[in-house]
């Protein structure tokens, strides 16, 4: 007993010499009373906050229905009832790679043509269906071309490959069929002009303002476009509709998160450099204006968004030097998602990985997760 006491005292004295652990630094700082005001008004009612004691299936159903309403997607469904999307297939172009590349388009609402690349492995056969990768881009006006490896010039090629950003081309080499679509308000082909620079000369913000006036959001428009592509893909003879993977970086990751939360046809989701809470504890809002869903904090937060993906597969990927996001906030969210997935009965179907650089794709983190998830589906 005496020995134990001596050892305890020694340990206490030793700890006195250890440097104090620093508390995580705030992501930003607001002056008072602004800081308190922001955190107070942004707290929200959290009406669909996850509760482990609730029935998981019922919680998901009600939370998903409310999210569809909140984004304005329900409004779009009403406004566009009876409209039939039309797909136009372009001329297939052979590449020096192991796949063909075809620039196509889909009319998702009257007069709105969404261009997309369709990548098909050259060895694809009608006797065997292949998994699909749907990969919408973020704030890159050449985004669909970047992801599909359809480079405009050498400078574009070097920029994309320097960050391993040709994620669609990578997937096609791995035997995936790929749909790399333009993202509304972000692709050069689908920008909303800001003629008088009233919206800061930012096309994505102009899109937000116009959408809000019509009872929808850019998120709703973008999810709508992805769903119409999924409708078409499900009927494609070469696509295995039970093995659909979705990914995108930055704004493309935000779109991946919302689409997967709303549409259960996505089996594996990898939102890159995007999946985080709505705001930091100081009140800083992490995502671009165009990702805004009004009253989202009255609904819940991104942990609930991730909870709508469960028990399907969800990998969060971030870069350690990405200045747009806050590691302590992301790490906390990762732990919260583990608990939600545990409640769904699939604790191992979500993970958080950190890449060693900034705001970009991390294929070395993504592909092992995808392969493992799809292998499970085949068992």
Model regions and ranges:
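N-terminal targeting or regulatory segments adjacent to alpha/beta-hydrolase or S9 domains
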Residues: 20-100, 108, 379
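Glycine-rich active-site/cofactor-binding loop and its immediate structural neighborhood
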Residues: 91-152
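Glycine-rich nucleophile elbow surrounding the catalytic serine of serine-hydrolase chemistry
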Residues: 248-258
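Short beta-strand/loop motif that positions the catalytic acidic residue
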Residues: 309, 316-318
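Alpha/beta-hydrolase fold nucleophile elbow
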Residues: 238-250
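C-terminal catalytic histidine-bearing segment of alpha/beta-hydrolase fold enzymes
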Residues: 335-379
């Amino acid at each position: 007993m005496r020995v134990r006491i001596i050892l305890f005292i020694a340990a206490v004295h030793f700890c006195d010499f250890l440097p104090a652990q620093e508390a995580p630094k705030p992501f930003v700082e607001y002056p008072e009373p602004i800081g308190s005001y922001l955190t107070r008004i942004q707290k929200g009612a959290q009406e669909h906050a996850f509760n482990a004691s609730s029935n998981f299936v019922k919680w998901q159903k009600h939370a998903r229905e409310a999210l569809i309403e909140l984004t304005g997607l329900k409004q779009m469904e009403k406004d566009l009832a009876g409209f039939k999307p039309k797909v136009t297939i372009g001329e297939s172009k052979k590449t020096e790679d192991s796949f063909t590349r075809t620039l196509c388009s889909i009319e998702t609402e009257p007069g709105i043509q969404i261009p997309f690349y369709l990548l098909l492995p050259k060895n694809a056969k009608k006797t065997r269906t292949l998994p699909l990768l749907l990969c919408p881009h973020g704030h890159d006006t050449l985004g669909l071309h970047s992801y599909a490896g359809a480079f405009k010039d050498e400078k574009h090629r070097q920029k994309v490959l320097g960050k391993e950003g040709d994620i669609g081309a990578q997937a096609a080499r791995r035997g995936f069929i790929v749909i790399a679509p333009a993202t509304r308000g972000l692709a050069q082909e689908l920008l909303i002009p800001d003629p008088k620079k009233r919206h800061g000369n930012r096309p994505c913000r102009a899109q937000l303002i116009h959408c809000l006036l019509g009872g929808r959001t850019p998120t709703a428009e973008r999810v709508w476009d992805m769903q119409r592509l999924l409708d078409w893909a499900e009927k494609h003879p070469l696509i295995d509709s039970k093995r659909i993977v979705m990914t995108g970086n930055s704004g493309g990751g935000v779109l991946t998160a919302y689409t997967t939360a709303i549409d259960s046809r996505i089996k594996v989701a990898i939102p890159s450099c995007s999946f985080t809470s709505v705001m930091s504890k100081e009140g800083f809002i992490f995502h671009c204006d165009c990702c805004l869903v009004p009253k989202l904090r009255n609904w819940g937060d991104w942990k609930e968004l991730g909870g709508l993906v469960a028990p399907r597969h969800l990998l969060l990927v971030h870069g350690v030097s990405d200045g747009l996001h806050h590691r302590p906030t992301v790490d906390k969210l990762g732990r919260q998602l583990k608990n939600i997935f545990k409640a769904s009965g699939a604790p191992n179907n979500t993970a958080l990985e950190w890449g060693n650089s900034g705001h970009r794709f991390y294929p070395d983190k993504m592909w092992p997760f995808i392969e493992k998830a799809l292998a499970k589906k085949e068992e």
